[in-house]
Amino acid sequence: REQLALWQWISEYYMCTIGEVMSAALPGSLDKRLVDPPKRRTRKTAPYTGPIEPIHALSPTQQTSLDEIEDLWQADKDIVLLHGVTSSGKTDIYIHLIQEQLNAGKNVMYLVPEIALTTQLTSRLQCIFGDQLIVYHSRLTDAEREERYKQITNQHSIISNNYVVIGARSAVLLPLQNIGLIIVDEEHDPSYKQAEPAPRYHARSTAIILAKMQKAKVLLGSATPSVESYYFAQKGIYGLVTLSERFGGVELPDITLIDLKQQYERKEMYNHFSDPLVERIQE
């Protein structure tokens, strides 16, 4: 019922047909199976057999940010923006929050803007969550997407196991139930907006609606928040938590602005590189 309601919202808000939404949400192989159903399907993904690693403890700064996030959720700020500088350890905070949701019997949806980021995170998260991790994105084969889709829609499995579904934009359309938390990492990234074909939806906005339908919490993470999210946070519509210290106390790099127009006029360029940049590289 909630999945149909979400599809209906996407159809109305983004002005497309419900059929276009369903086409984007359902694995392509499901249509083929209706026409020519195979006699037997085998599991495509081997179960994880590697070691399960413990979750690393947070630094005092990270722990303070995590506590602030949970305090805001307790104060009915269901959407929180985590404004953390680059390399501040936002992912570590995500992992702790994910584990808390799994311990509470809830599922978690973890959205990243690029499929490449999904690949990088998978190995790290799988060492912690094992077979509870489900990866879903558009570069999977039809058979792989169907397998994961069925794993998510298997209600008996959902009852006995809680999942962390990590994926790019299309993962927000999955029929995951019993969601306790939706994480939208790098929430400012334009890749969350579908351009072609329809439905031309924004995964961040869709995730917020999905969370409202399931009474789940939302955590938006970014070092450079989008204008709209930061505005809502400043106005108090969203909760705001700032993580301004890089993990391990590493200082932020110094930034120098170079006027390339002046560099060209002064002939202080080496091919396409300014002389100050070349000097710093040589150092």
Which role does the model predict for each range below?
Residues 1-222, 229, 234-250, 283:
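Accessory, non-ATPase domains that flank or precede helicase/AAA+ motor cores in DNA-metabolism machines
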Residues 75, 95-101, 258-283:
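Conserved interdomain hinge at the start of the Helicase C-terminal
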Residues 133, 255-257:
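Generic structural signal for residues in well-ordered beta-strands
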